[in-house]
Amino acid sequence: MKKGIVRNILSVKYDSYKSEYWVFFGQSKNESRIIVYNKKWQKLKIIGENHFNFRAISSVFFKNHVLWFMNNPNGNSFVIKYDRDSELLQKGFEFPGPVWYSFSSDNRYFL
């Protein structure tokens, strides 16, 4: 990544289904992005960039899809569903503001 592209790494999550790291970046809309890396930290792909859809801190991984929770400082945030096969995005539930943290326990998920 070029110097000066982003100021903040919001979170780094390990995807145990694919053995990859998902890195969530963003301070401003233009700095927001999700990039996937392998275990050697080589960039595999950019899921999306330059939109608050790709500014998140919390995410949950499943076999066929990935969910993340937008952290939009300027408006409403949504659950975003990424389909692994088609690479399509789908907006889900709308939150009244940014989502900061989530955790899972015994296949239950909490925001």
Task: Enumerate the predicted regions with their spans.
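Short N-terminal edge-element motif at the start of the domain
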Residues: M1, I9, E31-S32
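Beta-propeller domains
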Residues: S19, K29-S32, H51-F54
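Repeated scaffold domains used in trafficking and secretory/extracellular systems
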Residues: V6-S11, H51-K63, F93-Y109
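Short strand-connecting beta-turns/loops that link adjacent beta-strands
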Residues: Y17-K18, S28-K29, K39-W41, N64, ...
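Entry beta-strands of beta-propeller and related beta-repeat scaffolds
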Residues: K18-V23, N64-L67, R108-L111
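Recurrent small/Gly-Pro-centered beta-turn motifs in extracellular repeat architectures
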Residues: V23-Q27, F69-N72
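Trp- and S/T/G-rich repeat-edge/linker motifs of beta-rich repeat architectures
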Residues: M1-K2, K39-N53, K81-W100
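Structural motif
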Residues: K29-V36, N74-Y82
